[in-house]
Amino acid sequence: MPEVIELEFHSKDVSEFQLRRLVRASVRKYTVPVTAFISDAFIADDTCVGVSFDHSEKDDAYHRADGSILHTGKIQSARKEGRFWLLETQDGNYVIASFRRDLGRASFLKLLQSADRF
């Protein structure tokens, strides 16, 4: 029987494509515990910014609720697990479910290229 996945949207509409990617990312098993899944991701100053889903550190005031904007700590490593990128940062492990349409993938590729120089 399929597992039921509940998403609460508080501040961002999500396209069908993004929703499918979030569901696929969330049912996969990862080698480390995942802090949150990120949609509409882009890279800025060696950090990832995007829309957070299924964050492990929700509180009573709904901080970090599904659909809220997330800004990670500095990215320490990035690796592909299955079809998704896993980011290890100062404050947790994040899975990129989808990139922001206009600059997301390009900013991520720039981060990967800058890491290759070292």
Describe these PLM feature segments.
Residues 4-6, 16-19, 67, 100, ...:
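Generic N-terminal initiation segments characterized by hydrophobic and/or small/turn-forming residues
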